[in-house]
């Protein structure tokens, strides 16, 4: 099977349906792979770890294709959001220090939301996106926080979400409950 077809099917399966928004992210990710000359694993994924970082400027369907193809996720700390509600993606390669920002061009007049899927599917990535100057610095690597067990509920949370009261760790939910009763 053709790698692009396999990637599309994987994106659609992950996302749950096919739509214009997913197509935008799919084409954006393919364009980033092409422009940055990135190597894909057999699965099609580019970034098995944190070497690639994507800053998405929207929280739309398009981001699911970024997750699948570029391997950028919030949990790994290499997918971040700078919300401008634009279909724009800034991608950094930690190994090469290269970065790129691509922005979706305006839809031609007459293309509706309903027929946008066919429109975006029919275009090559270079026809859909402008490459613009990168507007930000490479984000720092994710800071993995120490975990603590809440002395009240027994659940574990990272140090950013724990408060110490009388020397005992409390998760934010238990802290809020305790403050309500006091």
What are these regions (language model features)?
Residues 1-14, 153:
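Short, hydrophobic/aliphatic alpha-helical segments
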């Amino acid at each position: 099977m053709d790698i692009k077809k396999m990637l599309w099917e994987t994106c659609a399966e992950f996302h749950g349906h096919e739509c214009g928004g997913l197509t935008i992210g799919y084409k954006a990710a393919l364009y980033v792979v092409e422009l940055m000359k990135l190597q894909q694993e057999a699965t099609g994924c580019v970034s098995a770890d944190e070497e690639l970082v994507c800053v998405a400027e929207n929280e739309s369907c398009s981001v699911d294709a970024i997750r699948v193809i570029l391997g950028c996720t919030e949990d790994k700390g290499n997918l971040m959001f700078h919300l401008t509600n634009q279909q724009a993606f800034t991608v950094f390669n930690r190994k090469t220090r290269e970065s790129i920002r691509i922005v979706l061009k305006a839809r031609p007049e007459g293309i509706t939301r309903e027929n946008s899927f066919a429109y975006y599917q029919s275009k090559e990535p270079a026809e859909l996106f402008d490459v613009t100057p990168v507007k930000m610095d490479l984000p720092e690597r994710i800071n993995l926080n120490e975990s603590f067990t809440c002395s009240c509920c027994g659940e574990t949370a990272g140090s950013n979400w724990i408060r110490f009261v009388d020397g005992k760790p409390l998760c934010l939910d238990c802290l809020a409950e305790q403050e309500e009763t006091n």
